[in-house]
Amino acid sequence: MARTHILGFPRIGERRELKFAQEAFWRGDRTEAELRDVAAQLRRRHWQLQADRGLDTVATGDFAYYDQMLSLTALLGALPRRFGLDPARLTLTQYFELARGNREQPAMEMTKWFDTNYHYLVPELDAETTFDGGPAWFFEEADEALALGLRARPVLIGPVTYLWLSKSHVAGFDRLALLPQLLQGYRRILDQLKARGIEWVQIDEPALCLDLEPAWLDAFDTAYAALREAGPKLLLATYFDTAADHAQRAAALPVDGFHIDLVRAPEQLAAWQAALPAHAVLSLGVIDGRNIWRTDLRRVLDTLRPVQAALGERLWLAPSCSLLHVPVSLAHEVRLDVELKSWLAFATEKLDELSVLGRALNQSDAVVAEALAASDAAQASRRASRRVVKPRVQQRLAAVSAGMADRASPFAERIERQRQALQLPLLPTTTIGSFPQTAAIRQTRAAFKRGEIGALEYLERIRAEIAVAVRKQEALGLDVLVHGEAERNDMVEYFGEQLCGYGFTENGWVQSYGSRCVKPPVIYGDVYRPEPMTVDTARYAQSLTERPMKGMLTGPITMLQWSFVRDDQPRATTARQLALAIRDEVCDLEQAGIRVIQIDEPALREGLPLRRADWDAYLDWAVTAFRLSASGVQDQTQIHTHMCYAEFNDILPAIAAMDADVITIETSRSAMELLEGFGDFDYPNEIGPGVYDIHSPRVPSVQAMERLLDRACEVVPPQRLWVNPDCGLKTRGWEETEAALANMVSAARALRARLSARGATTWKRLSKPAAATAAAVPHAGNACTACATHAN
């Protein structure tokens, strides 16, 4: 009998109950007991969903009040010492302070969970870190499930992955030195689970899918030799990529089973079957835990039947990874197009699919004939639907030539024409795009969406906001202006709503971090632009000023990365379709008199595959998509792009290949350290290193920004430098925004004056600046939350 199980379930609730309970607790409107009660209700509901579908075990320990890595850090007792907390007496208030900071300490660093759009809290380790245990919440959850008569299978992030994802602020400290102490902490956890009669524990080790150095591979041997003595059977789970190259070594570990991701890496099945010990189970992730499309159940059954014949009861079935990454249920999607809805499966529906697969294997296809027929119908509907494949899009895509991704002239020639056309001063000042989204702006958009105000009144209100933004920028003395984006709820949904091939859910929320949830749009078919999206707004904004007004667009890779993407064609193909749609908008903006056009790509690095061997292929099509979107304009039109919170050094050749005339980046928190890579690489185009951190309400002084600009000039010649904040300003208030921008303009003018006094437009390149004293860049490798898709 094949067993069925899941690796984890979304914790937010189908109506985002956890989010609202968290935020009420933070406001002081709910007690800790009330928050705990909401959490317990959600856990029971989610376990019951699994039990009702006949799953052999229910996942426990996958719940977290904020983040599973933070909860494991608390369970181990490895809290950052700077907070001065007693792990054994940790309260929920203190737990949340670790994630959100307090008056004395900033929050723990947050970054992306592998290549997903979920963020985790990064453990802070050093030689003094101990793993003596913390609150008993993890065990209490297992007790809750056992008390309900359920077969609990607790879920733990494995010790090697935990160390891999941690960091140390002590230079040269080897995190692996902590492995022996860490394993003692894990053994105590497993001992307590064994004492409760737990048969199986799921140990997640997605790090096994990465490029690991020998010392880290050796750590797996050490870790599982130690944990074997603890008692419960261990299911070692990998996901997000192939672990086939480590299959032989992993199979020798003293564990009782393995989980592999056959959605992301179906080719690894043969290697794992060949390596699997005779005693071990093999859990196959055959339902996509990261996307929302229904599974082709017959195709999966064709894959599973030979495996079942070989393994018998040692075959387990599961989604590819935790269902954390998909919405909870389709039940509340009452307005979603009926045909599109029939193609989708959220977490609850994926439980149904898993149940069907298990019953088909363990009984017969006849028992689930109706469900298999429905699956067949959904697949046939997608293949035949006229909304999916658009001949004119396919024809246009086929006609794309390599030369279409190239500007007419090289940068050295373009920039001279742009300088002549734009007549900007040395060190031109600008912002990244958005201005404060006031309550009045949000209310206007909501009223229009509800039909409470008409299109004309909505347009008048938005134009009034644009006029305010333009006046404020002129008064501040900025050189290149923006319209402020008052009409945009976010940088992906706004464009997706105007592109064919996109769909939108009402309740398709997914946790990004803590209480922050995102509702990604759905790319279901060929993408094209039926009409201009931003041209009228940009034209109006430009009419209010003589200064250059930037057109503001989201790039094709960010549109792709922050959506649920169709799975019936390569992502590269969808990216090219998006690029052509954006290209049309870029050309129309130019025709409307917009001389500076920004195409934001904060998610470019997020798309990198986990294995470096796969990077070149991704970067090739991603960079080509950007170039295709940007290259239809004349030399005089200046193309900007923006990237934030990223480590660029290992992909600088690809960034240079994008050939944007100006790139703006986040650098203020790292005291311009990030810029050094651009200098060492001799980045050829213009660059705007952010001179102040928009994520902080603190208004930086003129002197502080001057120091950052001085440092920037040591790396990049001043004639190629722009002056700008780190990111968009939508999350800030107007008072702090105006004060910070006024200081920024003053800093730029002061440096211009100093350069002018020397009669110089160049700056002698000094030796590398001393190491920064600023905190390390958070979200390394990821877009910042100010650039994230619409969240709530």
From Swiss-Prot:
The positions making up the signal sequence are: none
Q: What is its EC number?
A: 2.1.1.14
Chain sites annotated for binding 5-methyltetrahydropteroyltri-L-glutamate = 16-19, 112, 516-517, 562, 606
The record places the active site at 695
- Which co-factor is required? Zn(2+)
Binding residue positions for L-homocysteine:
432-434, 485, 600
Q: Which Gene3D superfamilies match?
A: 3.20.20.210
One MF annotation (Gene Ontology) recorded for this entry: zinc ion binding
Per UniProt, Zn(2+) binds at: 642, 644, 666, 727
- Annotated L-methionine binding lies at 432-434, 485, 600
Look up the domain of life of the source.
Bacteria
Under which pathway is this protein filed? Amino-acid biosynthesis; L-methionine biosynthesis via de novo pathway; L-methionine from L-homocysteine (MetE route): step 1/1
Key words, A-Z: Amino-acid biosynthesis, Metal-binding, Methionine biosynthesis, Methyltransferase, Repeat, Transferase, Zinc
- GO annotation, biological process: methionine biosynthetic process; methylation
Q: How is the cofactor bound?
A: Binds 1 zinc ion per subunit.
Kindly state which reaction or reactions the protein catalyses.
5-methyltetrahydropteroyltri-L-glutamate + L-homocysteine = tetrahydropteroyltri-L-glutamate + L-methionine
What does the function comment of this entry state? Catalyzes the transfer of a methyl group from 5-methyltetrahydrofolate to homocysteine resulting in methionine formation.
- Give the protein family: Belongs to the vitamin-B12 independent methionine synthase family.
Instruction: Identify this protein by name.
Output: 5-methyltetrahydropteroyltriglutamate--homocysteine methyltransferase
Q: What organism does the UniProt record list as the source?
A: Cupriavidus necator
